[in-house]
């Protein structure tokens, strides 16, 4: 497997969240970063990409900048945009890091509700009443083809470009930055799982 980072959390247990990350068997370095703040109800999983440790740096920037922006009053989408701009600026300042980026998924709790935001193919799943449901939608070439009816679900699972993303923090593509967003409410015994695509 590729590198994988994951965090899961619950609204109703005393042990609110836990996380694990692993570089996988193909890489020597782990480019995933995690931020877990049970007290403020904020969790981030970022999966970096890019040479010269660029992915490691990009994911670390995301996990530092997003909580910082939110602590200063930014909304969740603005926090992702600020992290994106910081990663792009770092790549401009250090040419060896140009092209680095990171997928990201964020959960921010607000009382009995929470909001999620993401860019790329890191995912969030909700476990509720015995069912695991994906809440995020990948920003990927294959997902676009699936939505437009060019691929079936089965074809998408085995497509050779299934891991080619269409957006991430740090991307300077003409398509620009895509951010997905949803709100939901906690129900009894709900769990959320945030993970990189390596899981």
Task: Report each predicted region and the residues it spans.
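PP2C/PPM-type serine/threonine phosphatase catalytic domain
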Residues: 2-199
């Amino acid at each position: 497997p590729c590198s994988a980072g994951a965090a899961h959390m619950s609204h109703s247990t005393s042990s609110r969240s836990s996380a694990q990350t692993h570089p996988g068997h193909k890489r020597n370095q782990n480019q995933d970063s995690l931020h877990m703040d049970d007290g403020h109800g904020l969790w981030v999983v970022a999966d970096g990409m890019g040479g010269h440790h660029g992915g490691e740096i990009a994911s670390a920037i995301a996990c530092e900048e997003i909580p910082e922006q939110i602590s200063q009053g930014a909304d969740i989408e603005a926090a992702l945009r600020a992290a994106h701009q910081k990663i792009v600026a770092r790549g401009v300042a250090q040419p060896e890091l140009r092209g680095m980026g990171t997928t990201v998924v964020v959960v921010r709790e607000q009382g009995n509700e929470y909001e999620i935001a993401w860019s790329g193919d890191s995912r969030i799943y909700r476990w509720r009443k015995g069912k695991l449901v994906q809440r995020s939608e990948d920003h990927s070439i294959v997902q676009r083809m699936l939505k437009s009816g060019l691929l079936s679900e089965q074809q998408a699972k085995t497509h050779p470009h299934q891991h080619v993303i269409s957006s991430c923090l740090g991307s300077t593509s003409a398509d620009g930055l895509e951010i997905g967003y949803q709100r939901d409410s906690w129900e009894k015994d709900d769990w959320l799982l945030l993970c990189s695509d390596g899981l």
